Amino acid sequence: MITADIFGSLPDGRCVTKYTLSTHGASVSVMDFGATVLSVCVPDRTGAAADVLLGFGDLAGYLDNPACYGSTIAPVANRTDRAEVPLAGRIYHLPANDGPDHANNLHTDLARGLHKRLWSTELFEDDNAVRFSCELADGELGLPGNRRFAVTYRLDKEAQKTARTGACALKWSMSARPTPRLM
């Protein structure tokens, strides 16, 4: 079963929605801001449901979330040496925001990355799943290529949670460019 509730509002007034996938005493809550996992509640050995995920109780915590708890990080997760991405004979520069003297890059862009965006949502009631998707234009966040990112969260009948991520370069023109992805 999937339920949807307003989780809060962004500073620009757009609503953030929390989706809860439930089955047999377990539940997973996710939100469309950052395609973020909010909670994973599972029965303990006595059968009482408990949230086993580290996170925040309200949207404000996720708006200022330097550890990126629960968030989908893309297009590049983790560190990029010297904040440079060599691709197809060219060097692309990302914000230098991490490491000694802030010489490296962490998570593409901590201020404007996909974990700081409202994603589109598609519900799959029959599969007890929700898919979030987000698009980036060529050059956006410092990387080439028109790109679409998607993550699907599913809680099956046996209370097994799965997450699938994916990205693809979109061929919106004859000059589609290569693009990196590390999610």
Regions found by a protein language model. Name each.
Residues 1-183:
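Surface-exposed acidic/polar loop and edge beta-strand patches at domain peripheries
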